[in-house]
């Protein structure tokens, strides 16, 4: 039987990303735990030496990658591996947060244009597998905008698996104007890996995605003017990185050429507009009455937007694409890799949010389709 007092306790918040899952409790200023969205299953039928485990989660899986088959249950922002996702949530509930899911409501962020079947499967799993008392799906971009104390604006969201521009008006996303690019941080990391091998750097540790990802995060940047940067830096060493095995790799213009694919996806054979044109395209699909409001509140969200130089390059190109004299403001919070989680924490801590929960009683009466009517 549903207990309404179960909604009075702090909610568990999951921000499920292709690369990272962030978990914590509502009302807190940031997620308590951030783990890699990966599971490692033993390559052999016996548990890993001296450990009674058949699978490993997050960083532990990445650390033991040579003995494991790595599975990423979220691809391009969408849950695709449900069995592995269940294990990951179980790990977060029990091992990381130390809570009983049957005693606390759960809010999950979801990507824009999340398919109906995935939304309903999420609700089904939370209510039937984990027996949560309440559940809510919040649009990832809406939550990120909320963290910036705005309800109208355009969110530029780029994480590990997908990049999208999402116009939001008075707290609701405008699906017809969402622009999505199936390319983000993971693709930049893979592009850098290919470049390292092509340059003759075939050290075994480069096979470890975490190492190359760290190189990207520490050294790569977005050039304000790529062609001018190329003329200026050709042949120069722009950065160096010491690998775990002690070898030192020196880098030149590839440090800005690799992430340039965000603004020129055709370099990876992806025939889609780059980031600046995505912003312009999304805004132009909206009613003319709100276009200036969207330009005036562009909010960056997601770990890939932390690349140095991205904010300045985006501002320069959006100014060129917008009508002359259009006021443009870009907000780039230092903690924007967690902005959706933070926004969800703020939302769920408000007393008015209690009426938003889809309760276990609602689920029992209406079934999985209840999320279509209540979460938007």
UniProtKB/Swiss-Prot annotation:
GO terms for molecular function: chromatin binding. SMART domains: ACTIN (SM00268). It is found in: Cytoplasm, Cytoskeleton; Cytoplasm; Nucleus; Cytoplasmic vesicle, Secretory vesicle, Acrosome. It comes from the Eukaryota. It holds the Pfam family Actin. CDD domains: ASKHA_NBD_actin_Arp-T1-3. GO terms for cellular component: acrosomal vesicle; actin cytoskeleton; cytoplasm; nucleus. In skin, expressed in the basal, spinous and granular layers of the epidermis. Also expressed in hair follicles, sebaceaous glands, eccrine sweat glands and semen. GO terms for biological process: negative regulation of DNA-templated transcription; regulation of DNA-templated transcription; regulation of smoothened signaling pathway. Changing residue 124 to K: Found in a patient with Bazex syndrome; uncertain significance. InterPro entries: Actin, ATPase_NBD. Keywords: Cytoplasm, Cytoplasmic vesicle, Cytoskeleton, Nucleus, Transcription, Transcription regulation. Transmembrane segments: none annotated. It is linked to Mutations and insertions in the coding sequence or in regulatory non-coding elements of this gene may be associated with Bazex syndrome; a cancer-prone genodermatosis with an X-linked dominant inheritance pattern. Negatively regulates the Hedgehog (SHH) signaling. Binds to the promoter of the SHH signaling mediator, GLI1, and inhibits its expression. Belongs to the actin family. This is Actin-related protein T1. It comes from Homo sapiens. The gene is ACTRT1.
């Amino acid at each position: 039987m549903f207990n309404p007092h179960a909604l009075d306790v702090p909610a568990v918040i999951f921000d499920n990303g292709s690369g990272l899952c962030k978990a914590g409790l509502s009302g807190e200023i940031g997620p308590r735990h951030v783990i890699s969205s990966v599971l490692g299953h033993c390559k052999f039928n016996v548990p890993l030496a001296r450990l009674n485990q058949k699978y490993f989660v997050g960083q532990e899986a990445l650390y033991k990658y040579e003995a494991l088959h790595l599975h990423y249950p979220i691809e391009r922002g969408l849950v695709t591996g449900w069995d592995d996702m269940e294990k990951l949530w179980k790990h977060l509930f029990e091992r990381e947060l130390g809570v009983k899911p049957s005693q606390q409501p759960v809010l999950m962020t979801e990507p824009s244009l999340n398919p109906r079947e995935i939304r309903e499967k999420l609700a089904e799993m939370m209510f039937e597998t984990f027996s949560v008392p309440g559940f809510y799906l919040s649009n990832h971009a809406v939550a990120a905008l909320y963290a910036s104390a705005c309800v109208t604006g355009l969110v530029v969201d780029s994480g590990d698996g997908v990049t999208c521009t999402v116009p939001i008006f008075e707290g609701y996303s405008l699906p017809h104007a969402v622009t999505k690019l199936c390319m983000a941080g993971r693709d930049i990391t893979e592009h850098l890996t290919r470049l390292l091998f092509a340059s003759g750097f075939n050290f075994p540790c480069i096979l470890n995605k975490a190492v190359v990802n760290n190189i990207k995060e520490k050294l790569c940047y977005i050039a304000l003017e790529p062609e001018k940067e190329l003329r200026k830096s050709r042949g120069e060493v722009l950065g160096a990185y010491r690998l775990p095995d002690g070898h030192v790799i020196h880098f030149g213009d590839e440090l800005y050429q690799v992430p340039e694919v965000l603004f020129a996806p055709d370099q990876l054979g992806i025939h889609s507009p780059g980031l600046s044109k995505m912003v312009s395209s999304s805004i132009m699909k909206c009613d003319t009455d709100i276009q200036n409001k969207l330009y005036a509140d562009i909010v960056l969200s997601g770990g890939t937007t932390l690349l140095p130089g991205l904010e300045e390059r985006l501002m320069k190109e959006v100014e060129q694409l917008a009508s002359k004299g259009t006021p443009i403001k870009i907000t780039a919070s230092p903690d924007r890799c967690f902005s959706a989680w933070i926004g969800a924490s703020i939302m769920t801590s408000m007393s008015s949010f209690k009426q938003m929960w889809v309760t276990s009683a609602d689920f029992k009466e209406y079934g999985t389709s209840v999320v279509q009517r209540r979460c938007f």
